[in-house]
């Protein structure tokens, strides 16, 4: 099934090119619309560690949480012809934002459901996050008051975090949660980056009644390629972890509502929910203290979900 869907994505440009050869392209001002908006980004991203030698069970998980990071978002769309549109969109954070990180380990194989080690880092920053999206739409219905179309595109997103200070509860070799303490305030503990690359397919549409308009978009990908980089800065455990995961699932739902203040200008609000589901992938580590490295197949997991709310202006030229 995924192979068939990927075939649709790859052959869409060919089909559109063939169709375009029978139509006349007209680059006129009223073929273009653009929008810009401001809003917030909230969500959580997760990294996991699995042990293949213990049946692939999860032994570690780090949850990076962020709330209400300010973002700016923009898009431009060009109607090549009544049936075909191309577009570009993207957003970026306007600065760093405070967050939170929790790191838990399950090292006791005889009691895998109970964590043995935990550290909490309330002094965590979302350093930056951004995304770009290139897409093409084919309109099945295209009337003055409503549109419905299929879409295909390519999207990339990035996230960067730094956790500082914090507290910990560890288990010694002889005990259980018996080592309690804290890290120096402001000292870097862990730095983490994620990147997601994906082709996708989707469905988009809108409906207008007088000066009010509702719209929505659904996107899906089964071909997400994600990667991450985890830097442990502890001088006694200076380790870099890098992981790659392929063919993850991605889901996105966006809904917007707007009002035309002039025939060409619309103010609107929008909410978008996005998720990349967890899947196992390969990981490597490099120990800077010992100059040693290791590699593990199916030893990592990467996941991300977020919610974006924006308010902005759309203008048709």
From Swiss-Prot:
The similarity comment for this entry is: Belongs to the peptidase A26 family.
Provide the transmembrane region boundaries.
Answer: 32-41, 70-78, 84-92, 131-140, 146-156, 198-209, 212-221, 251-261, 265-274, 307-316
Hey, what's the signal peptide range on this chain? 1-20
Query: Which Gene Ontology molecular function entries are recorded, alphabetically?
Result: aspartic-type endopeptidase activity; endopeptidase activity; serine-type endopeptidase activity
Q: Provide the membrane-side ranges marked Periplasmic in the record.
A: 21-31, 79-83, 141-145, 210-211, 262-264, 317
List where in the cell it is found: Cell outer membrane
Miscellaneous comment text of the record = Was originally classified as a serine protease, but it seems that OmpT could have a novel catalytic mechanism involving an Asp/His dyad and a pair of Asp. Encoded by the cryptic lambdoid prophage DLP12.
Q: What disulfide bonds does the UniProt entry report for this chain?
A: none
Q: Name one GO cellular component term.
A: cell outer membrane
The reply to whether Signal figures as a keyword in the UniProt entry is yes
Q: What does UniProt list under activity regulation? A: Inhibited by zinc.
Q: NCBIfam families per the record? A: PRK10993.1-1, PRK10993.1-4
The answer on whether this UniProt entry bears the keyword rRNA-binding reads no
Q: What is this protein called?
A: Protease 7
Report the membrane topology from the UniProt record: Multi-pass membrane protein
Q: What is its EC number?
A: 3.4.23.49
Q: Which PROSITE patterns match?
A: OMPTIN_1, OMPTIN_2
- List, alphabetically, the InterPro entries matched: OM_adhesin/peptidase_omptin (IPR020080), OMP_A26_sf (IPR053724), Peptidase_A26_CS (IPR020079), Peptidase_A26_omptin (IPR000036)
What is the stated purpose of this protein?
Protease that can cleave T7 RNA polymerase, ferric enterobactin receptor protein (FEP), antimicrobial peptide protamine and other proteins. This protease has a specificity for paired basic residues.
Per the annotation, which location comes first and is thus the protein's main one?
membrane
Task: Explain what the record says happens when changing residue 238 to L.
Answer: Loss of activity
* Keywords, alphabetical: Aspartyl protease, Cell outer membrane, Hydrolase, Membrane, Protease, Signal, Transmembrane, Transmembrane beta strand
Active-site residues annotated for this sequence: 103, 105, 230, 232
Query: What is the species of this protein?
Result: Escherichia coli (strain K12)
Instruction: Summarize subunit and interaction data from the UniProt record for this chain.
Output: Homopentamer.
Q: Which domain of life is it from?
A: Bacteria
């Amino acid at each position: 099934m995924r192979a068939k869907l990927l075939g649709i994505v790859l052959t869409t440009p060919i089909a559109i090119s063939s169709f375009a050869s029978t139509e006349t392209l007209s680059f006129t001002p009223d073929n273009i619309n653009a929008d810009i908006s401001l809003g917030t980004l909230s969500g959580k991203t997760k990294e996991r560690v699995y042990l293949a030698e213990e049946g692939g069970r999860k032994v570690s998980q780090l949850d990076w949480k962020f709330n209400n990071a300010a973002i700016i978002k923009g898009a431009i769309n060009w109607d090549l012809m009544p049936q075909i549109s191309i577009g570009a969109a993207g957003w970026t954070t306007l600065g760093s934002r405070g967050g939170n990180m929790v790191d838990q380990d399950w090292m006791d194989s005889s009691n895998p459901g109970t964590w043995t080690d935990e550290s909490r880092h309330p002094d965590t920053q979302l350093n930056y996050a951004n995304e770009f999206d290139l897409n093409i739409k084919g309109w099945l219905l295209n009337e003055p008051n409503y549109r419905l179309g299929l879409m295909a595109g390519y999207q990339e997103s990035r996230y960067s975090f730094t956790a500082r200070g914090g507290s910990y509860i560890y288990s010694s070799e002889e005990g259980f949660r018996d080592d309690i303490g804290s890290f120096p305030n402001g000292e870097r503990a862990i730095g983490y980056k994620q990147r997601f690359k994906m082709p996708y397919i989707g469905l988009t549409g809108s409906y207008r009644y007088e000066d009010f308009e509702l719209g929505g978009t659904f996107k899906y990908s089964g071909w997400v390629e994600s990667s991450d980089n985890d830097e442990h800065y502890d001088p006694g455990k200076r380790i870099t972890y890098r992981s790659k995961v392929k063919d993850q699932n991605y889901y996105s739902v966006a809904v917007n509502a707007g009002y035309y203040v002039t025939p060409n200008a619309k103010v609107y609000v929008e909410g978008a929910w996005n998720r990349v589901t967890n899947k196992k992938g390969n990981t490597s580590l490099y120990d800077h203290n010992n100059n040693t490295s290791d590699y593990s197949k199916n030893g990592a997991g990467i996941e991300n979900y977020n919610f974006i709310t924006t308010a902005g202006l759309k203008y048709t030229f």
